[in-house]
Each structure stands twice: as C-alpha cells, then as structure tokens.
Regions:
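Gly/Pro- and small hydrophobic-enriched strand-loop and loop-to-helix capping segments
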Residues: 183
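Catalytic cores of alpha/beta
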Residues: 100, 161-177
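Radical SAM [4Fe-4S] cluster-binding motif and immediate context
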Residues: 1-155, 173
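Short glycine/proline-centered loop/turn elements that form peptide/ligand docking sites
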Residues: 158
Length: 183
C-alpha cells in the first residue's frame, strides 16, 4: 500500500470463464455482473469521503471487457480525486493493451496483478484457460504495464493435475525471466 488507510472495492462480481482450478465458478455461480462506470466512480468518491487514502480492487476479472474497464478508469479520472489504487486480481494477459494500461495509470492505478498460473502453454490449455492466455501474451502484458508506469505482480501455480516435472520447471524459469515487482 502507498497510503493508509486502505479499503477494498469491487466493481464487478463473478467470472465469464470456467478455469478448472478456480472456485469462482462455484462460489459466485450467479454469473458475471458489473457496475456502471459512473457507479464505480461514485464508490471511489464515497471511499475518499470516508477518509480512505487508497483502495485495492478485488474483481476476479476487471479486464474481461476492456471497453468497460477503460470507461471505469475514465470516470475515476474525472473525479479528480488523488487516490492511488491497485488491482490485486483480474488483469487478463490476453486483454492487455497500451490504451488500457494508460487509462489504468491515469486513474491512479499503480499496480496490477496477473494470474499467469503456468509458464507452459500446454498446461494453460489443460487448466481450462482454453488457449486464451499464452506465455507470450503474458510476457507482452508485463512489458506493456511496465511501459505505462504500472508495477506488476504475478501469480503462479505448481503441482496441479496436468503439471509434470518439465512443466513445473518451465513455470519456474518463466517466473524468473519476467520483470515482476512482486510474486
């Protein structure tokens, strides 16, 4: 955290994906719902008015809809509130683009977290990522976020059913090779 006190925010709930390892498809089985960008900005203003100096966004997949995510960032920017925030979850590597990260940064976002899961494309497919996310996309996402001035965090998993010794070593090598600020 950059400033205390910090609070949590949630602009969307649920997930449109059904990754094998994730509990969201069961615990949040009502599907994917998101608030309007205006409502999100109102909540940020309310948190600020309550005395919070920073928030952590807890959405499972903030960037499943880049247009919506950019609109949320634009609405937060319009409030002119100096309130840094981080996205502790929910940045999809396949959705990462320069415009998105510029919007995130402009709105006060200073850190994003990526669920890389594995450094092996075959394991990513077997995990239920469906070929949507690849190791190359993950590398590009980190570079693009960092170029926009955003710190990066990565989540990895080892030892799930499709993993082999080779795929786990691929994941370890991948984690060592990318310039993350946290993992």
């Amino acid at each position: 955290a950059k400033r205390l006190p910090v609070t949590m925010a949630e602009f969307s709930r649920g997930c449109v994906f059904k990754c094998d390892f994730c509990a969201s498809k069961i615990t949040l089985a009502l599907g994917y719902r998101k608030k309007s960008p205006e409502r999100c900005a109102e909540e940020v203003k309310h948190m600020h008015d309550l005395g919070f100096k920073e928030f952590m966004l807890a959405d499972d997949i903030f960037t499943s809809d880049n247009k919506w995510a950019k609109n949320v960032c634009d609405e937060i920017t319009k409030t002119n509130i100096d309130m840094p925030w981080s996205c502790s979850n929910g940045i999809r590597v396949e959705s990462a683009d320069e415009d998105l990260f510029k919007s995130l940064r402009k709105s006060g976002c200073y850190r994003v977290s990526f669920g890389f899961e594995s450094g092996n494309d075959e394991v990513l497919k077997l995990f239920g990522k469906g070929g949507r996310a690849t190791v190359d996309q993950a590398k590009t996402a980190v570079q693009t976020a960092r170029a926009a001035g955003i710190d990066t965090n990565g989540y990895f998993m080892l030892g799930l059913s499709p993993d082999t010794e080779k795929s786990m070593n691929d994941t370890i090598d991948f984690a060592r090779s990318i310039p993350l600020d946290m993992m």
